């Protein structure tokens, strides 16, 4: 099928031959259920709207309210702009997803590729929470301000229903696992009108989790977003992978040790390094923990460095039952983010 996915190829054949994609036919050919309304609507789309050389899945989940019910398999969503701006990196990622039969789709109406940050956060019960998306790091730069996606519009055009919150919070700063959520303390400076206790209490109720706050780097020049997903990741509720403490600032080391003790966590060191220069001040190259985790698959960024093997081995040991794939994602990474940043994973 080349670069085309099953859905795209099937619907293209239907369009050319005036075939009605009935639910039974869709199931027989594509391999899973797709409503006749969805199939018929997609059949009317032009070849350009189906991206010609990219797969656009059309599996719509029933959303009577703001909860996805009855779905445990996860789907990876990406901004359409990822394929437009970084086709090679996007196709490398798609190739890995297709290899492991991971469903994926592209989000319409976005203004940048960092969909993790502006899309709703899904709780473990399945609810979508749409936080306010107005990060301070986009302010003061006209190009960046104009790249801020209108979250309400993105949800509308992609038929996503979410509960709204007035808390200013990026999705990349929320890590959820088994009743716990890790966020960086950048949440407090992003919401100056709320007290720390108010924020933690409200977030706990919205996310249905115990809230754990970790320190972000003080310097915005070194970490302009302050997102938790660039510092740590959950293995399970009592174990986290994190940037190697011995290579980090003392105040970060002290904070992590305090958090480890307070919440009875095991901390597994992962190597990291920085390659920022005058041309790429926001580069995320060197951050292995910003991997993509979906279903039974983990896609780890590698950078052509000796640290690659060590990082991959550590992550594989932490997730012995997961399949580990690696990817060169550098053309995206130099812009300030990696795999978790450019994907939105929901079930």
Q: Which stretches of residues belong to each language-model region?
A:
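Generic N-terminal simple sequence motifs
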Residues: 17-19, 316
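Short coil/turn linker and secondary-structure boundary residues
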Residues: 20-21, 194
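Amphipathic alpha-helical segments in structured regions that serve as interaction surfaces
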Residues: 2-14, 21-37, 43-46
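The feature marks the mature, well-folded catalytic cores of soluble enzymes
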Residues: 49-347
């Amino acid at each position: 099928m080349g670069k085309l996915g099953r859905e795209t190829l099937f619907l293209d054949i239907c369009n050319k031959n005036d075939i009605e994609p009935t639910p039974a036919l869709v199931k027989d050919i594509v391999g899973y259920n797709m409503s006749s309304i969805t199939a018929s609507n997609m059949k009317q789309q032009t070849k350009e709207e189906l991206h010609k050389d990219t797969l656009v899945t059309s599996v719509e989940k029933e959303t009577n309210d703001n909860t996805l019910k009855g779905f445990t398999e996860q789907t990876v969503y990406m901004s359409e702009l990822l394929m437009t701006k970084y086709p090679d990196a996007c196709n490398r990622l798609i190739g890995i997803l297709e290899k492991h039969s991971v469903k994926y789709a592209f989000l319409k109406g976005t203004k940048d590729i960092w969909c993790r940050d502006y899309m709703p956060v899904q709780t473990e019960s399945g609810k979508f929470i749409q936080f306010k998306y107005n990060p301070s790091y986009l302010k003061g730069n006209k190009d960046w301000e104009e790249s801020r996606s209108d979250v309400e519009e993105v949800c509308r055009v992609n038929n996503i229903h979410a509960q709204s919150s007035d808390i200013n919070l990026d999705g990349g700063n929320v890590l959820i696992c088994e009743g716990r959520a890790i966020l960086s303390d950048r949440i407090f400076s992003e919401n100056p009108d709320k007290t720390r206790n108010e924020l933690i209490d409200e977030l706990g109720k919205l996310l249905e989790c115990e809230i754990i706050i970790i320190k972000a780097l003080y310097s915005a020049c070194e970490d302009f977003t302050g997102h938790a997903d660039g510092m740590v990741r959950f293995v399970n509720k009592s174990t986290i992978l994190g940037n190697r403490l011995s290579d980090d600032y003392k105040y970060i080391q002290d904070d992590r040790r305090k958090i480890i003790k307070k919440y009875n966590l095991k901390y597994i060191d992962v190597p990291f390094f920085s390659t920022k220069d005058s041309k790429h001040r926001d580069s995320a190259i060197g951050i292995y923990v910003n991997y993509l985790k979906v279903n039974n698959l983990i896609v780890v960024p590698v950078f052509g460095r000796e640290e690659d093997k060590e990082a991959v081995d550590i992550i594989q040991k932490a997730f012995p039952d997961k399949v580990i794939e690696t990817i060169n994602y550098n053309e995206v990474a130099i812009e300030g983010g990696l795999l978790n940043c450019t994907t939105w994973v929901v079930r």
